[in-house]
Design a protein with these regions (language model features):
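Ser/Thr-rich, low-complexity intrinsically disordered terminal regions
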Residues: 1-114
């Protein structure tokens, strides 16, 4: 089972609007912003084991990049689990946690675009 997950999704909205919605989504999920580059439409965020009261079991690191695409924009998300010190977890991660965080992030992003 791969711990690193790569996820891409296209949206009809322009890249700046999608980037702003993605930032808002990370904040709504109580993510800790590690770095942000508004000019490059890119940010990195760390999520704790518990998101919106749901205990997931692992911390998760997400890198989100919004790119201009035909008829809108594309969101590229790369995510992986973290250990207690904040390093990339190479073994022992709980199954499905990273994908669950990506799904929650994507759901909030899409709600913020409405």
């Amino acid at each position: 089972m791969p711990y690193d997950i790569h996820h891409e999704k296209n949206y009809s909205q322009d890249a700046r609007s999608v980037y702003d919605a993605a930032l808002k989504s990370a904040g709504e999920l109580k993510g800790q912003m590690l770095s942000s580059s508004p000019n490059d439409l890119r940010f990195e965020v760390k999520f704790d084991k518990t998101i919106l009261g749901k205990v997931l079991g692992d911390r998760t690191h997400i890198t989100c990049v919004v790119q201009s695409a035909e008829n809108g924009s594309k969101v590229v998300v790369d995510a992986y689990p973290l250990d207690a010190v904040g390093r990339k977890l190479m073994f022992g991660a709980r199954k499905g946690v990273t994908q669950t965080v990506i799904d929650m992030f994507t759901t909030h992003l899409e709600n913020n675009l409405k």
